[in-house]
Amino acid sequence: MAVFPIGSHFAPPHQLTKRHVIATSSPISISTRLPQNVSFSKVSGVTGSTRLSKHGVLVRAEDKIRSSSSPSSLDEPIDEDLMDSSGLCDPLCSVDEPSSSYFEANYQPKTDIIKALAILAAALTGTAAINHSWVAANQDVAMALLFGIGYAGIIFEESLAFNKSGIGLLMAVSLWVVRSIGAPSTEIAVLDLQHATAEVSEIVFFLLGAMTIVEIVDAHQGFKLVTDNITTRKPKTLLWVVGFVTFFLSSILDNLTSTIVMVSLIRKLVPQSEYRKLLGGVVVIAANAGGAWTPIGDVTTTMLWIHGQISTLPTMKDLFLPSVVSLAVPLALMSLTSEVNGKEQDPKDVLASEKMAPRGKLVFGVGLGALVFVPVFKALTGLPPYMGILLGLGVLWILTDAIHYGESERQKLKVPQALSRIDTQGALFFLGILLSVSSLEAAGILREIANYLDANIPNVELIASAIGVVSAIIDNVPLVAATMGMYDLTSFPQDSEFWQLIAFCAGTGGSMLVIGSAAGVAFMGMEKVDFFWYFRKVSGFAFAGYAAGIAAYLAVHNLHFEIPTTVAQIPFLTGS
C-alpha cells in the first residue's frame, strides 16, 4: 500500500528546538516515540506531528507515547501544570516554547480568511458543476474526473495540508451525488447506496474491533511473551529468527502492529548500525508476507474474505508456501551480505526490559484467542466475521473490567481508554474510499474497465502480478476494492487462482518500496531510514522474494501439488 511522505508542516528547523527520540526500554511497546522531523502518512495524514497510518490500526505511535511516557523520559523538565492527576504528561507538553513562539509570530488572521473563502468558493463551484446538465448526460466521465481529483488529493495530502480522511469522505459523497443524478431514478441510486454501505460497514466494524483488541493486549505488554523469548545474538541467526517471528505474528495481527513490536525489539537487541537497519527491512518484508496467507493478517485479504472471494482454509493452504518463499528468498540473499556476516552482538549492549502489566499473560491469551476464533465463529454460525470480532471484544471488555475492578490507577488498561487511542480517522478514510469505489461499481465503470483488461490482457496472472507492483506505489485498498468491483464471483469463483493471487500480490507487493506499505512507513519513521537507502539495500531482495513467491504459487498449482493438511497425507509417515 503506497504512502507518499511529501513535505512537512513543522516550523523551520532552525527555529525549533531539536527533540531527541525517546527510546523506550521495552522491546515491544507500540508507543515508541518516532522522530518528529520525519513526516509520513499512509492512509490518514496528520500535519504537525509524526504519525503512523494503516487503515484500521493507524495513528498510534505518536499518541500513545503521550499517555505512556513519564515526565522523566524527556530531555527537558516539564511544567507540573501540564500534568494530570496521575502524573502523566498532557498532550500540550509536546508543544515547546520555540514552536509556540513561531506560531504566534506567524499567525495571520487575514490568511485564514482567504483560505476559508477559497474553500467556500470551491464548494460553491463544485455544487454548481454537479447540478449542471452535462453531469447527468456524461455521468461516467464526471465520476472518473471526480475520483481522479480526489485520489490525487489523497496522494498529495502532505503537500496540500489536507487530511486524506476528509478528502475521502468528500469524494465518496460527491460521487454518490453524481450517481443519483445520472441514475435512471433516485430510488435505484438509494438502493445501490444501501447495498454498498452494508458491505463496507462489515469491514469497518471488523477493523474497529480488531484494532481495539490489539490495543488492549499492547496496553498490558502482552507481546513481551513473544519478544522476550528471542535471546540469540548471532547476526545471521537473529536475521532468520526475527524474520519468521514477524511472519507468524503478522499472520494474526496487522502488519503495522507487528512491525512496531519487532522494530522495538531489535532496537533493544542491536545498537544503531547498518545491520540494525537491515533487520528492520527484514521486518517489513516478513510483516507483509505474513499477512498475505491468512484472512485476518492484512486488510486486503480481510476484504476479500468478508466479501466471499476467498475462504479460510483454502487460502491458508494455498498461500502459505508462496508467502514463506517470498520471505525465505530475501533472508537467504541477505545472509550473504557483509552486514549480516559481522561479529556477534555483545550482551552488555542489550537494553533492560520493562515489566509486563498485571494479568498481561491472561489478556494476551484471551486477545489472541479472540482473533484466531473469528474464522471458527464464521464457520460454525455462518454469520459475518465482524460478529465474531465483536464477540471477542465483548469478552475481553468484560474480562478487563473484572480483573481491574477497583483499580483506579489502571484505567488506561481498560477498553474505554483503548477506544480513545485507536485511530477512528483511519476507519473513516476506509469508509470513504470504499464507498467511492462502490459508486464506480454501481455506475458500471469498473465493469467497463474489466472488459477492457480482458480484451487486452487475457492473462489473469499478469493482471494480479501488475496489481502487486502498482500497490508499492498506490494505495492497495482502492486497488483491491476496484478489482473486486471489476470481477464478480461468476467471472472468477471463490478461491480461484485469480483471487488468491490478488490476495498474495497486493499483500506482498508493498515491500518493494519503503512507502509501499504501512509496515515500511513505520520502519522509516522509527529508524530514520530514507527512501533511497531502502531502495538500494532492501528493494532488490523484496522484489526477488515477490517474484519467487508468485513462481512458487504457479508451480504448485500447475503441478497440482498439495500441501499435506493431515498426518495421513505425509508420505514418509504412511509408508507410501
Swiss-Prot record:
Give GO BP annotations, semicolon-separated.
pyruvate transport; response to salt stress; sodium ion transport
Q: Which GO terms describe its molecular function?
A: antiporter activity; pyruvate transmembrane transporter activity
Free-text function comment from the UniProt entry: Na(+)/H(+) antiporter that extrudes sodium in exchange for external protons.
Q: Give the tissue specificity.
A: Mostly expressed in mature and senescent leaves, and, to a lower extent, in seeds, roots, shoots, flowers and developing siliques.
Under NCBIfam families, the record lists: NhaD_1 (NF038006)
Which organism does this record belong to? Answer: Arabidopsis thaliana (Mouse-ear cress)
- Entry protein name: Sodium/proton antiporter 1
- Keywords per UniProt: Antiport, Chloroplast, Ion transport, Membrane, Plastid, Sodium, Sodium transport, Transit peptide, Transmembrane, Transmembrane helix, Transport
Q: Which family does it belong to?
A: Belongs to the NhaD Na(+)/H(+) (TC 2.A.62) antiporter family.
Q: List the subcellular locations.
A: Plastid, Chloroplast membrane; Plastid, Chloroplast envelope
* Membrane topology classification: Multi-pass membrane protein
Phenotype of null mutants: Decreased biomasses and lower chlorophyll levels after sodium feeding. Increased Na(+) levels in chloroplasts in high sodium chloride conditions but impaired photosynthetic performance. Altered levels of phenylalanine and tyrosine.
Q: Which InterPro entries match?
A: Cit_transptr-like_dom, NhaD-like
Could you list the residue ranges that cross the membrane? 237-257, 279-299, 320-340, 357-377, 379-399, 426-446, 462-482, 501-521, 541-561
Transit peptide, start-end? 1-60
Any one annotated GO CC term:
chloroplast envelope
Keyword Membrane in the entry? The reply is yes
